[in-house]
């Protein structure tokens, strides 16, 4: 009987660990999904041909203060990693962002697959715990 309790405790520990992994994956998926949404909006802006011409608008510079600004859509300053930025033509920026979107989608799909496998294993563990509990109650 003591062996069953230890085995049950181990199963519960494994289930709790898997649950924390699932929660972690959910958090990463949510974060990547938010990034994906922002990148899609940016790509839509870059592809918007109606606003090819320079456009005057107001941008917030902080503390509720705005400044008039002009956006020219022929070149953009783009982060390339490690705090490094480069100036790039519009079409190259669109291509780069499209590639990033594909990578983000691939990452989200991989994480969803990992999550599905973990959830299946988690559910099997819960069934084993329930089965063990039923056996202990019948003893």
From Swiss-Prot:
Keywords: Chaperone, Cytoplasm
GO cellular component: cytoplasm; prefoldin complex
Localization, UniProt: Cytoplasm
Coiled coil spans: none
SUPFAM superfamilies: Prefoldin
Disulfide bridge map: none
Any one Pfam family match given in the protein's UniProt record, by short name: Prefoldin
InterPro entries: PFD_alpha_archaea, Prefoldin, Prefoldin_subunit_alpha
GO biological process, one term: protein folding
Principal localisation: cytoplasm
Domain of life of the native organism: Archaea
Biological role: Molecular chaperone capable of stabilizing a range of proteins. Seems to fulfill an ATP-independent, HSP70-like function in archaeal de novo protein folding.
Name by which UniProt lists this protein: Prefoldin subunit alpha
Native organism: Picrophilus torridus (strain ATCC 700027 / DSM 9790 / JCM 10055 / NBRC 100828 / KAW 2/3)
Gene: pfdA
């Amino acid at each position: 009987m003591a062996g069953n309790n230890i085995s049950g405790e181990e199963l519960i520990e494994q289930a709790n660990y898997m649950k924390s992994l699932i929660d972690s994956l959910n958090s990463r998926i949510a974060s990547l999904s938010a990034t994906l949404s922002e990148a899609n909006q940016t790509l839509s802006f870059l592809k918007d041909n109606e606003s090819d011409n320079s456009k005057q608008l107001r941008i917030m510079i902080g503390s509720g203060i705005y400044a008039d600004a002009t956006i020219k859509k022929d070149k953009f300053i783009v982060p390339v990693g490690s705090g490094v930025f480069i100036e790039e033509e519009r079409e190259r920026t669109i291509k780069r962002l499209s590639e990033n979107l594909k990578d983000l989608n691939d990452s989200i799909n991989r994480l969803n697959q990992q999550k599905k496998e973990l959830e299946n294993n988690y559910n099997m563990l819960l069934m084993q715990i329930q089965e063990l509990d039923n056996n202990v109650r019948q003893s």
